[in-house]
């Protein structure tokens, strides 16, 4: 089967936004306009398409699929058909893991901002993640019809708050209820959309006289940015004072793909204006899979290799989301980086070292799913029938194994005990929790060895709340939830040199003998545990050295102060001794464990607590209350800023343990007019009085 759309005409994009910026409406309109251009299966007449839109509007759809495929020929039908795969990204900070996961498989992104609210805290988190994965992006300022809408204010905020380099390629005609359309700065024509056809038809008209100066000024800025793409263009621009349309588009495209600039557009999705021009910008400026560097991975021998976005390459893909579908069961969404695969083929899950047969392959479209026989480089699809795969796994050709760059998922910072309400819920709860943990790698489930309770851990109170709610809605499990517990850690602040660990046991017959000497020192934050074998002259035989390491690793799970996991330490195994008959692995494991415990006591152990980056948006009148309250929670205020449309943003770093129930107290502090977001920042040493309270609470 030949490829329907050349890979150069693929666009794998995400649409990302703060909760209220209007992402769903924007995405919905994209599906509507692309659906009008290209119908899958039977071709409807215009009226039926409109009906579909209306009925979807009544239901207030959100795309439930993790990836949806649409087609676009340009708003004037002037492009060859392009295939746009839209990957859904959530808009809440507790789910940044979801955003991170989708950023990993995107080639480009549309960042949607509210013309009134501007750049909000969540927008910054998403922007940072897009920077981390070097995702080229566009900015779309939505809700231009709302009271207080201001395109140029959002432009300033993108520069100041995100340190972005936005380049407007359109300028709005009017704002608020007078928002009429946009001026296309590349064509220097105004675009007015036809309201009767819900924006599917439009006219190019002359620029309104009152906007002529503004447009001239912004066009000059845009052309200058384009000219900076190369020396030749700059010379051409200096000679002629302008550049041809094709040169401008190509130069802006090159600079967008290099992440140097972000083309900026605007509109109102709700009123059917502007999304059409944004889709053209996706084609003009965002990369196809062949425009970005090939994906890198690791071969079996540990060497680095890359896989080019080509059908001729060996097959490689990444599973990026797992969903449970009421009709077909578990769906694994995967992004194909190279090669071709057919339903029925055997794949290797190289992350887990297991082979599996690929069952059905589904492609999701706006309002229906299509079963397909094969997928090729650049495609995004869902697989049915893969039992082993979880988020972040590489699925590849069994004859050519490769593990693509692994996704790094954050450690949970909060945990709660959950108990089923009835005996019948017990079994269902186990199944439900496992299924949810499979879908979401930042959610963990374990059993507390001492109490036998089931403990769930995640990225924040809301994260756990939503998972418990899903357990009830999707799996019918009623559960009671304990008080949230903070995930503390232990580490050391000084070095303990040459500490002995000796395990000797003589009890008739063969004894036990293991002796290890270690030096323990602090490691860099986030580096975890490192072990260095510095044994000389065979004082400990080679085969027993891994046992010492294993003994230490077992002990790391429970520190000497209050039994919290130990992080960021280096251990040097420097000396030891053995007995020809009595030494064995177990004895050296015990010796390693004893040496580590003793060394840790001597190395100034401390308790670490998770610190959260908290941002509060509040009207100015309540500023004093909010700041005082944050200080009372051991918070350190790190800055304040004015918000678009009045109000203040307070940024602070606050220990997680002090933030429980914060939403309730913020509501009363600011009479329900303040909002906040919170995300994990780093671990920090707990002050002595706090650490003492934590240790004594743990020992009760």
Swiss-Prot record:
Record carries keyword Cytoplasm: yes
Matches recorded under SUPFAM superfamilies: EF-G C-terminal domain-like, P-loop containing nucleoside triphosphate hydrolases, Ribosomal protein S5 domain 2-like, Translation proteins
Ranges for domain tr-type G: 8-290
Keywords per UniProt: Cytoplasm, Elongation factor, GTP-binding, Nucleotide-binding, Protein biosynthesis
Any single GO CC term annotated in Swiss-Prot or TrEMBL for this entry: cytoplasm
Molecular function terms, GO-annotated: GTP binding; GTPase activity; guanosine tetraphosphate binding; translation elongation factor activity
UniProt entry tagged with the keyword Chloroplast: no
Biological processes, Gene Ontology terms: ribosome disassembly
Pfam families according to UniProt: EFG_C, EFG_III, EFG_IV, GTP_EFTU, GTP_EFTU_D2
Residues reported to bind GTP: 17-24, 88-92, 142-145
Gene3D superfamilies: 3.30.230.10, 3.30.70.240, Elongation Factor G (Translational Gtpase), domain 3, P-loop containing nucleotide triphosphate hydrolases, Translation factors
UniProt subcellular location: Cytoplasm
CDD domains on file: EF-G, EFG_III, EFG_mtEFG1_IV, EFG_mtEFG_C, EFG_mtEFG_II
InterPro entries in UniProt: EFG_II (IPR041095), EFG_III (IPR009022), EFG_III/V (IPR035647), EFG_IV (IPR047872), EFG_V (IPR035649), EFG_V-like (IPR000640), EFTu-like_2 (IPR004161), G_TR_CS (IPR031157)
Assigned protein family: Belongs to the TRAFAC class translation factor GTPase superfamily. Classic translation factor GTPase family. EF-G/EF-2 subfamily.
The protein's role, per its UniProt record: Catalyzes the GTP-dependent ribosomal translocation step during translation elongation. During this step, the ribosome changes from the pre-translocational (PRE) to the post-translocational (POST) state as the newly formed A-site-bound peptidyl-tRNA and P-site-bound deacylated tRNA move to the P and E sites, respectively. Catalyzes the coordinated movement of the two tRNA molecules, the mRNA and conformational changes in the ribosome.
Name of the molecule in the record: Elongation factor G 2
Organism listed in the record: Burkholderia orbicola (strain AU 1054)
Gene: fusA2
């Amino acid at each position: 089967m030949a490829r329907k759309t050349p890979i150069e005409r693929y666009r794998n994009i995400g649409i990302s936004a703060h909760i209220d910026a209007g992402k769903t409406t924007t995405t919905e309109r994209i599906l509507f306009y692309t659906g009008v251009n290209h119908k899958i299966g039977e071709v409807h007449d215009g009226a039926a398409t409109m009906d579909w839109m209306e009925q979807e509007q009544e239901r207030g759809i959100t795309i439930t699929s993790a990836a949806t495929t649409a087609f676009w020929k340009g708003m004037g039908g002037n492009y060859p058909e392009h295939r746009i795969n839209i990957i859904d990204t959530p808009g809440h900070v507790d789910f940044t893991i979801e955003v991170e996961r989708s950023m990993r498989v995107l080639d480009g992104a549309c960042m949607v901002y509210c013309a009134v609210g501007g750049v909000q805290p969540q927008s910054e988190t998403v922007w940072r993640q897009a920077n981390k994965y070097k995702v080229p992006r566009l900015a779309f300022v939505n809700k231009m019809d709302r009271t207080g809408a201001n395109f140029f204010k959002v432009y300033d905020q993108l520069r100041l708050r995100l340190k972005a380099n936005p380049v407007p390629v359109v300028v709005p005609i009017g704002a608020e209820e007078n928002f009429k359309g946009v001026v296309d700065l590349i064509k220097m024509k105004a675009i007015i959309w036809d309201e009767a056809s819900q924006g599917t038809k439009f006219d190019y008209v002359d620029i309104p006289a009152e906007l002529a100066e503004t447009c001239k000024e912004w066009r000059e800025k845009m052309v200058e940015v384009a000219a900076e793409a190369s020396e030749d263009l700059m010379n051409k621009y200096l000679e002629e004072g302008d550049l041809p349309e094709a040169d401008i588009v190509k130069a802006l495209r090159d600079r967008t793909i290099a992440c140097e600039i972000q083309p900026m557009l605007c509109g109102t999705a709700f009123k059917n204006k502007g999304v059409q021009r944004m889709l053209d910008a996706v084609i003009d400026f965002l990369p196809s899979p062949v425009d970005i560097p090939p994906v890198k991975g690791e071969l079996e021998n540990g060497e680095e290799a890359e896989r080019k976005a080509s059908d001729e390459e060996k097959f490689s893909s990444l599973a990026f989301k797992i969903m449970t579908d009421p009709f077909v069961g578990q769906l694994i969404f995967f992004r194909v980086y190279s090669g071709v695969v057919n339903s029925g083929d055997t794949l290797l899950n190289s992350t887990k070292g297991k082979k599996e047969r690929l069952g059905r392959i589904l492609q999701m479209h706006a309002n229906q799913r299509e079963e397909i026989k094969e997928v090729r480089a650049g495609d995004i699809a869902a697989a049915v029938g893969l039992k082993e795969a979880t988020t972040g796994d590489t699925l590849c050709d069994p004859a050519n194994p490769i593990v693509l760059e692994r996704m790094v998922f954050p450690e949970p910072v909060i945990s709660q005990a959950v108990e089923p309400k009835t005996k019948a819920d017990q079994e269902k709860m186990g199944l439900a929790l496992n299924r949810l943990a499979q879908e979401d790698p930042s959610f963990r489930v374990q059993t507390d060895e001492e109490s036998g309770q089931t403990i769930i851990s995640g990225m924040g109170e809301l994260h756990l709340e939503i998972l418990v709610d899903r357990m009830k809605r999707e799996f019918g499990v009623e559960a009671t939830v304990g008080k949230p517990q903070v995930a503390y850690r232990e580490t050391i602040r000084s070095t303990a040199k040459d500490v002995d660990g000796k395990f000797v046991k003589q009890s008739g017959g063969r004894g036990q003998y293991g002796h290890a000497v270690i030096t323990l020192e602090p490691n860099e934050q986030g580096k975890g545990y490192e072990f260095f074998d510095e044994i000389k002259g065979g004082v400990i035989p080679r085969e027993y050295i891994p046992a010492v390491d294993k003994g230490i690793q077992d002990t790391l799970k429970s520190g000497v102060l209050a039994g919290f996991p130990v992080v960021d330490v280096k251990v040097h195994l420097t000396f030891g001794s053995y007995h020809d008959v009595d030494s064995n692995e177990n004895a050296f494991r015990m010796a390693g464990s004893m040496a580590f415990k003793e060394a840790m006591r001597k190395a100034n152990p401390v308790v670490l607590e998770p610190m959260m980056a908290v941002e509060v948006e509040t009207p100015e009148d309540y500023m004093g209350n909010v700041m005082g309250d944050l200080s009372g929670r051991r918070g350190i205020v790190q800055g304040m800023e004015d918000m678009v449309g009045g109000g203040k943003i307070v940024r602070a770093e606050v220990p997680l343990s002090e933030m429980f129930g914060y939403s309730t107290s913020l509501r009363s502090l600011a009479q329900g007019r303040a909002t906040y977001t919170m995300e994990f920042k780093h671990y920090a040493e707990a002050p002595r009085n706090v650490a003492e309270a934590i240790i004594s609470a743990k020992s009760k």
